[in-house]
A protein has these predicted regions:
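Small/flexible residues
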Residues: 4-5, 77, 104, 138
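Sec-dependent N-terminal signal peptides
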Residues: 4-17
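Intrinsic structural disorder/low-complexity segments
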Residues: 6, 84, 156-159
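Non-cytosolic coordination micro-motifs
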Residues: 20-55, 90-183
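Accessory recognition modules or surfaces
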Residues: 24-25, 29-35, 53-79
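Mid-chain, structured segments of secreted extracytoplasmic proteins
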Residues: 61-104
């Protein structure tokens, strides 16, 4: 009986260990590493490091991502130096469409079944949102244009650079705990 309980306990422990959340990856590189290790692996993929003027725990790099020239901003926790965010800044002149990029990312990473980046009707205004763009069309403004946008009867163009953020939840919590421990 003890042997059966021991075997069951071992299966539960091993199963629990294998079910732990995997760290975020960027270009196949795990973000659960130090800044120097992460930067060296990116250099191996053709990225070059840019000068950094007074931005502690941050590295800037240039390279190619999704077939486009981009600039990366990589941040790490101050004490552990673990990477917790990679921000991908596309060139302002990069020609892309929202739907093409969305399809590319969904093909690579799958759908998380959450509704993002949709037009929404609200009491006072219609709002189109991405992580970085918010358009608010008040009732007092041109309601005809607002209705056309909501009904998808017109196209729109945002003249903003595209920014993608890869955030490792575990390492960002470590960074937050380090900051809180300083106070």
């Amino acid at each position: 009986m003890k042997r059966i309980i021991l075997i069951l306990t071992m299966f539960l422990v091993v199963g629990g260990l294998s079910a732990q959340e995997q760290p975020m990856k960027f270009l196949g590189i795990s973000m659960n590493c130090t800044m120097n290790t992460f930067v060296n692996k990116l250099k191996g993929k053709g990225f070059t490091q840019e000068p950094n003027d007074n931005h502690p725990n941050t590295v800037f790099m240039k390279g190619t991502f999704a077939g486009e020239k981009v600039k990366l901003e990589i941040r790490a926790a101050a004490k552990t130096h673990l990477v917790y965010i990679v921000v991908v800044n596309f060139n302002r002149s990069t020609s892309y469409t929202y739907e093409n990029l969305k399809t590319t990312l969904l093909d690579k990473y799958g759908d998380n079944n959450k509704e993002y980046n949709k037009l929404k009707e609200e009491d006072k205004y219609a709002k189109f949102t991405t992580d970085y763009i918010v358009w608010r069309l008040n009732e007092d403004s041109e309601t005809h244009q607002c209705n056309r946008l909501v009904l998808s009867q017109c196209s729109y163009r945002a003249n903003f650079p595209l920014v993608l953020s890869y955030i490792d939840g575990k390492n960002s919590i470590i960074d937050l705990q380090e900051v809180e421990s300083d106070f």
